[in-house]
Each structure stands twice: as structure tokens, then as C-alpha cells.
Amino acid sequence: MELPHDKAWAYLLLTPPPLRDYFIQLPKPATLQLALNRFAAYLEKQYLRDSLYMEKIVIGTHYNVRKNRVLQPRIFVSPSNYTRILSTFYDHPDLIAEVLPIQHLSKSQLKRGGLTKNVLTSGLPEMNNEQNPYAVFEVNTIDDLKACFAFPTEWLIDILTGRNSISLHYTIDRTSIPKWYAHLEARFQYSDGVTKSLTDADLRQHYIGVQPIPVTCEELLQKMNDASINGNTMYRVHGYESIVSSRMETVNDLVKASGKPYDVVNVQTMSSYSRSISKAINQAVTKDRHNKHVGSTKLKNSQGPRTTIFVMPPYITVDVVCSPMTIKPGLGPIQTKLLKSIVDQSPRRFRIAYAAKPQIEQDVLNKRIFSTDEGPESYFQGVELLTPEAKSLLTALPQLVGTFHYEKLSYAHFPSYRLTAGGYNVDYFKRGVTVIVARKHGGKGMVAKLIWKLGTPVIDSDDYGRIIKLVEAGLTIDDAVTQLFSMDYDQRNSTVSAFDEHMEMIVSQSKMKQEITYPRASDPRITAFADYYSKWFLKVPYSDYVASVKNFVTKNGLSGPNGIQSTNHYDTLVIQVHTLPEATQFLGVNNIIEVYPIIDSYIGMILRQQTSNTCAELLLARYYESIHLRNFDMLPVGVVASTLEALVG
């Protein structure tokens, strides 16, 4: 059976049949890049979760209906080289775990959808116009087959969903396209056998016309000029109150200077800004659903049509030029090998974006050259990197020797307002109870030390595990809290968590090799730990733990870093957690935000060796990630850190 040569949709490799059927109803992109853009545009509105190849995927349609689906296996066909590939296939354990060789697939296997694993075969049977439910790819060598798994699915989905701050568009533009993308572009069989055309108008209609698009201050100026020409369009402008253009003009300044009676909605925080965007999108989609045509953001009122505009804040972008890097002596063999790989692949020049705050701008302008010995915190305050190699390099800086200098300071606007959710206004750290969600080695420690300088006590994310260890020893929750939080800051942080201790025990007793790599959620050691975590999560409810901590802090205060002592009240209290289950177990919370770094937290854990068993730490981090859903405002650590530094002076 000859494989079709239609241009394919690159994202369909990652989608199960229900989602694939949804995409096929839309116009077909003519190029690979348009397919990737569409995939990214869709996933920016959805949450997609991948744990391996038989993962549960959370899918949300325009109607916000969520269902669990299973990712389908793929079929890899090699009509002329099957025997040659098979001769070396069993020399590759990674492929054995992922692919099952079946030389002759039967029609019944495809018809009943009986495949439970990716398959390598010499050819496909005739289907007699019946539907093949699996995606099909042609491979000619063992390297072609390996390349289909060389671009980690989980890493790609991290990028697409914003769990890492690298944009898919930048990734594809600046790195080579994986071979499986090229295969997919050329050889995919549509499940309905229909080829549809695509025009720019179609793409705009499906992915732009249905929602209000955030604009930059510069674009707002142009829109105002256009409006003054036709004299008919009114604008409702939404903007965070401190958003400025690259010429340092605020939204209010621009509107006043235009002389037009536009409505300006100034919001106090970027989280409010993001919620207003979501509300407008829902209104547009609802209108589209009822009127059977693409929704417009024009709202009818007595003054005529009014268009909603969302104005994006700018970022400062700089090119960073690196000197040749060397590795600091005295590190272990695993760390040295990883650092050598990072240094060999690291770019000599990369671009980084910072939150557009005056102190960052002055630092960039006044401090042109700096050394890796001056502390890595300022590097981590960026909000966007354009390449994964630069991300690895920034993560490794504390273990490297070298210098940098800045070039080409400019302003830029990123199209994804996801990066600004939560915003620059962190005054809520000064009042009420705030919960910060962050992965391990995700910048919590740096943020906590800055918050402590405001006089606000911070409860560390590992304190819950430390309390459980004391409860295991026979103490009540209240007695355990009293014992732990009566210690000074350094003593408290040096106390071992029950979770770290138990994961290390599981790893030491397991017969599996202790690999220092990114773990899979299906790892049996993670499954074993999940039983332990669930048991103690029920025995020591997080709500009871927080209530006891609040009571203790109210009566006694709390010791912080560098001799800081909080006052004896918890009107302002920050609680750091690892996961959504912990963050949602108690009431009386003023704000819940999630922070994420631009560095690679897994590489960071390998290099810093905070615990005695790095393998156990990686597994524990992977478990926290596997039970966490991102339902909160996403806020770059760089935004929080730069704003807090401005507040504390």
C-alpha cells in the first residue's frame, strides 16, 4: 500500500483521535510552520498533559468541556529496509521499550484498533477504503526511527503549554526541525480522506477573529490614528496601570494625547488584566456560537460600535555575549560531564528579556561587563529566553568561570499574555495570606529571602514534610509545629523532610539503576512514593497543618534569614507549596500564584546536589510535577524578583 504524500499537520503526532477529528474539521495549513503556529495557538487556550505514550490528556474545547483521552500508538513503516533496521534494532534498549516489531500487520489489527504500542512493520495491509485509526510514518534507517523519539514529547508539551518559558516559534526557528516532523509533514493519512485548503483569511478567521488580540502601545497609537481618519470606531482600552511604551508613555498619556473620548480601563494587577482578556474571549466565543459566524469584539452601545483593545506591557531585551567558559574544579564526575556538555553546546551570544522595570534598565546600561562569580540571581530574573541552550547555560553559571557583557538594549513585546499573568504589582505580599506554587529548584528560595526583607514571614514548601517526620515519631501536629518553628531559620531548613527521606529509602532499596536523568511519571519508584504521600496527606491534612502554623506565628512570630524576626501576627503570611493539592486545602487565602524560572530546574538539581541522593531528588520533583495542574496565574520568577528588589531597596 503506497503511503499518501499530502502535506500533513505537524501537531497530529501528539493528538488522540478525538482531538485529531476536531482539527481535521478546520482548514488545512499549507506549510509546516502554519501547522505549528496553529498547534501553539490552540494549546495556549488548553491544558495538555503528557506522562509517556499511554498518557491521560486533558482536553478543553471552545465549550470548556474536559475529557480524559489516551494517546494512540504510531506505526513506522519501512517497505524496503525492514530487515536491515531489525538487524540492529535490539541493540537499542530505548527503542525496545517504545516500539514493537511486527513484520506483517493484519487488517484486523488495524480495524479493531488493537495496537497498544508503537509498531515497526514492513508494510500496511489493504484497508479497502476503511479507516486506519493510526498515524503512519516512513523510516529508512535505524537512525530515522531513533529520531522519531529524539525530541522528548514531554519537553515539547512543556514548551507549548508554557510550563517552560521557551516559545515554540523560537524553538522551531532557531533549532533544526526533528526528523519526525519532516516525516509527518510528508506522510500522514487523513482519517476522513478529505483535503481542505487554507488561506490567510481562513487562519485569521479561526484563530484571530474569535478573540481580542492584545496589542502593544505602539500598535495602539496606530489604531488611534486609524480611528481618527475614519471617525467611526470607538475603543475600550484595557491596560495595566503602569504599562508604558518604549518611549515611556503610559496608556493614559497616549489616550489623552489622541484627543479621542476612548474608555480606558486601568486594572491594578496583571492578574485582573488576564481575567479581563479571558472574559472578553468568552464573550466573543459565546457570540460566535449563537450567531454562527466569527465573533467580533465590537460591543453595541448608545455611542455606536466599540472595540475592545488589550495593551501589552513591554520587556527590555538585551543580547548577552559570553566569553569562553571553564568549569570550576572540585565537582563530581556526573556534574563535570553534564557541565562539559553544556559548555560545548552553549551559544556565544543569546538574547534575554527582562521585565521592563527602571532598575533593570539602569543595571543593563551601567553594568556592561560582569563575571559569573558575582552571583547568579540577576541572570535568573529574566522572563524569556529564545533557545534551550541558553537556558542550560544560565542554569550552569554558578559552576562556571567566565564573563559576559550586554549589547543592543531594546524594547520588545511578546505575543503571549500568559507571560504577564499575575503582573508586576506584588503588593499582595504585604497583606493577607498568599500561596506561592513552584517546582523544586524553581526560584522559591530567592523569592522567599526578598519577601522576608519586607517583614513578611514565609513558610517553606519543605516544612510540611518536616512536620510529617515529627508526627511519624509520635508528636501531635501542634507539638510538631511548635518544635520545628521554634528553631531558628538555618536549623529549620537543615531539618530533613519525611518526603526526601522516604524517596531516598525507596531508591536505595530498588534494584533499578540510579540514573541521573529526567524521570518518567510511570517510574515504579514514583508509584511507590505516591502511596506513601497519599497516606500521610490524609493523616496530616494540609488544612490542619496550616491552621497550626498560623496559630503559632500569631503567638510567637517566626525566625527568618540573616537574623530577621517577624512580628507576632500572620496578617501577612506567604506559604510556599509544590502542588495544587496542597495549595487548595485551606481557606482564607488572599492570592494564589505560580512562579516559574527561565532556568532548567532539573539541570539545576543535578548540579547543586542539595540532597545526598540526586536521583531521589529528581524522582521527587517529577512526582510533584505529575500531580500538579496549572490552574493559577503564571508569573515569571524574574518579574517577582525584580519588583521585590525595587520594594525592599
UniProtKB/Swiss-Prot annotation:
Its main location: virion. The keyword Transit peptide does not apply. GO terms for cellular component: host cell cytoplasm; host cytoskeleton; viral inner capsid. It is found in: Virion; Host cytoplasm, Host cytoskeleton. Keywords: Capsid protein, Host cytoplasm, Host cytoskeleton, Inner capsid protein, Virion. It comes from the Viruses. Signal peptide: none annotated. The keyword Methyltransferase does not apply. Minor inner capsid component. Displays NTPase and RNA 5'-triphosphatase (RTPase) activities. May function as a cofactor of polymerase VP2. Associates with microtubules and plays a role in the formation, structural organization and morphology of viral inclusions, where the assembly of cores and the replication of viral RNA occur. This is Microtubule-associated protein VP6. It comes from Cryphonectria parasitica mycoreovirus 1 (strain 9B21) (CpMYRV-1).
